[in-house]
């Protein structure tokens, strides 16, 4: 995941992925993320906690300030609240990308699965786990306006469109 200070982001499943998801965060979302980085002194402050916990993989945060300074923080577990919040933001971005990929897939290949996928997306949306929600509007409009999808999926898509547009 790469994020620039103007809110442009790129999500890749693999480092050499040919077609990553490029998206733009809303200004308020971008501001929150970069304020967290600032609170962590540009990732210079130690955030690693050596408490024995299950190994779930290294989490690596990198910050390039643009003036040649590059900081990196690698950890498995942290108790630093700002680092946890920052990690949560990146997990939310990945979760949002996965929702969009799955929704686009079922719209194209599994019309009967659209309502279930929309329900999962709506659950994440209700729990404030979705970022860059405006990127979902084209596929939601496609579902809401296409009679080939079941009525409940069209109604759910229309309700989600209304909620996203009112944000």
Task: Report the location of each language-model feature.
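Short amphipathic beta-strand/extended segments with alternating polar/hydrophobic composition
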Residues: 1-5, 21-25, 68-79
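A short, structured beta-strand/loop element
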Residues: 2-11, 55-59
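A mature extracytoplasmic/lumenal domain signature
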Residues: 5-7, 15, 29, 37, ...
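Acidic/histidine-rich, surface-exposed loop or edge segments in extracytoplasmic proteins
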Residues: 8-21, 121-123, 138-139
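Short C-terminal domain-edge/linker segments immediately following a structured domain
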Residues: 16-20, 33, 92-95
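Generic alpha-helical scaffold signal
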Residues: 24-27, 55
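Charged, amphipathic alpha-helical segments
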Residues: 27-50
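Short, well-ordered, aromatic-rich surface patches in folded extracellular/luminal domains
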Residues: 46-167
